[in-house]
Amino acid sequence: MQHKGKVAKRSVTSTWMLSLFLASLCSIVTYLAGIGIASAAASKAYGKPGDPIDLVIGYQPYYTESWSGLIMRDKKFYEKYLPKGSTVTFQIGLQGAIIVNGMLAGKIDVGYVGDMPGIASTSHPEVRDVRIVSVLGLGLDQCNIFLVRPDAPQFATPDEGLKWLDGKIVAVPKGSCTDRFAQAVFKERAIKPSEYLNQSIEVITSGLRAGKLDAAVIWEPTASRLVQEGIARRVASGASVNERDGGFMVMPQALIEQRPDVVKAWLEAELDAVLYFADAKNAMDVAKMAAGQTTGFTEKALWASAFGATPKSEGGTDTRITLPYGFTPDAMELIQKASKFLVEMKSIPSEIRPEAIVPQFTADILKAHGLTAPVGEVKALPPEMYTGK
């Protein structure tokens, strides 16, 4: 087994963050409109079962809920399961849409993405048929985090913080999981911001620092970084209103059809990565892995994004991430809810196809191991459990 593709570190510049923003779901739509159906729909040849295979993995160390991907890169669990002579190359996607674009172009074979790009990736089978094969994680405060400017009033409860948003200036990267969450909360609570802005994370950071924004909705690990830098405060999360967020693994149907042996092998390794993530004794090791595969984040902020406890008065939870692996009822509910939102946003033409969800591989693997979904949880740990610098 060979391992290729060192992750090149990049400085956190305006170019980096602008790329993050421009890779929103809109880029998927633009990409789909700009490529030829005949060439894009052509199946990639993956060889015969048992043959060595060259895989390109798109993953997101900048989205905490999908960190089984960065664990996989570091621990190389796949070496135990893939055919001998196979190679694996990891490519960072600053946002899920970049990974989806690569998969639609036939350049990425396995994708670790958030709920919105994961669902959007399945919406144009005439371009390339992409399926969801596993649930990376579900949470209430991974993508769904309300931040306010640091000089905002102190709130005794998340409800108070949410009420304060009425008539305020709020920003999100629109089309993202944060946008879906914010709009759901505003509708449920009859909150009407004076302005609801579509901004990149960099612009949101600058706006909060300069006092030009009252609030924003941001995902982890960026939320923990902004809080630790004193740029913002947490006031509420999905736990405050029972709104979930999630991450999914996607693969092209061509790989599933041609190489079920490889799909099973990768998902066996994924189970190892998920169980490693769930074990609290590995928390510091996972934070170190994340620090080695990202730039612009302290190890402490990365640790906090996955494992750090937050007061319940700020939307904190006892479980930071539930690790379903398989397709639980909660995961299916999120898929349907997010799918409807994307249709309303005109990001996808119709709700998700039933065949776009492929539960059999994870179901068979869980049965073989005597496990049921969810297979684990990433529990919130007190700050003193962080033992790094």
Where are these regions (language model features)?
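Short, low-complexity disordered leader/linker segments with a strong preference
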Residues: M1-D54, T372-K389
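Sec-exported extracytoplasmic/periplasmic mature domains
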Residues: R73, F77, P83, L104-I108, ...
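Short, glycine-/small- and polar/acidic-enriched structural segments
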Residues: A41-A190, E195-Q199, D214-V217, E243, ...
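Conserved C-terminal helix/tail region of periplasmic/extracytoplasmic solute-binding proteins
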Residues: I335-K389
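Pocket-lining segment of extracytoplasmic ligand-binding domains
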Residues: Y196-L197, E202-E299
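Secondary-structure end/capping motifs
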Residues: Q258-S350
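Second-shell loop/turn segments in exported
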Residues: Y62-E65, K168-V172, K212-L213, P252-I256, ...
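Extracytoplasmic/secreted envelope proteins and their assembly/folding machinery
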Residues: K75, V100, L104, D115-G118, ...
